């Protein structure tokens, strides 16, 4: 299960989750546009319908999606740092909240896997501690709180996709 919190100054949201897969596999899931469109979302909340990514420093990325009420949204940005499979840093420019650009930092730390995992027995091998930190919410506590809720979902969706192949289409919808 993901843990997510907001810094005391409400400038940043940070979270982490363990994923029972090597960092290279997790990095692929968070950077490949086709995979992201499969796992990022849940009917009854929102879902991505289109993703584009030029995963290199200076490269651009964008996502288009639809909310549960049928309204669309967009988010885009630029990659600042790309160091597969351990680090990804990009700007985050949403169409739905504050006008401030934030920066998202993904860190992927290799972890040893031994014995049981909450999702069942696993072979000994490698896993990944996936950490995310989004900064730049100064003066926007409501935006920080909203993004904290979102990151908790996103980290869980990423884990379910990488570990079990769960997608938006196979995940149970949330009823409004």
Q: Which functions belong to the PLM regions below?
A:
Residues 48-91, 117:
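Glycine-rich portal/gate segments that line the openings of hydrophobic small-molecule binding cavities
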Residues 160-176:
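Short, highly charged C-terminal tails/helix-capping segments
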Residues 14, 48, 72-76, 99-105:
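Short, surface-exposed coil-to-beta transition loops
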Residues 1-46, 176:
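Hydrophobic ligand-binding cavity/cleft-lining segments
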Residues 16, 89-152, 158, 171:
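Beta-strand/loop substructures that line and gate deep hydrophobic ligand-binding cavities in soluble
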Residues 7-9, 53, 69-73, 96-100, ...:
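A generic structural micro-feature
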Residues 31-32, 41, 84, 156, ...:
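Residues at helix-coil transition
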């Amino acid at each position: 299960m993901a843990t997510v919190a907001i810094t005391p100054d409400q400038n940043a949201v940070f979270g982490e989750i363990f994923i029972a897969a090597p960092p290279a596999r997790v990095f692929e899931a968070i950077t490949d546009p086709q995979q992201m469109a499969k796992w990022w979302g849940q009917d009854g909340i929102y879902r991505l319908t289109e993703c584009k990514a030029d995963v290199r420093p200076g490269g651009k990325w964008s996502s288009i999606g639809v909310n549960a009420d049928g309204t669309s949204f967009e988010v885009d940005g630029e990659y600042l740092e790309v160091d597969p499979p351990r680090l990804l840093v990009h700007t985050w420019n949403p169409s739905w909240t504050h006008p401030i650009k934030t920066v998202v930092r993904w860190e992927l730390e290799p972890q040893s896997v031994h014995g049981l995992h909450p999702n069942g027995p696993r072979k000994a091998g490698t896993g990944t501690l996936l950490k995310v930190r989004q900064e730049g919410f100064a003066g926007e506590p409501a935006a920080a709180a909203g993004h904290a809720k979102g990151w908790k979902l996103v980290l869980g969706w990423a884990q379910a996709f990488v570990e079990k192949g769960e997608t938006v289409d196979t995940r149970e919808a949330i009823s409004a």
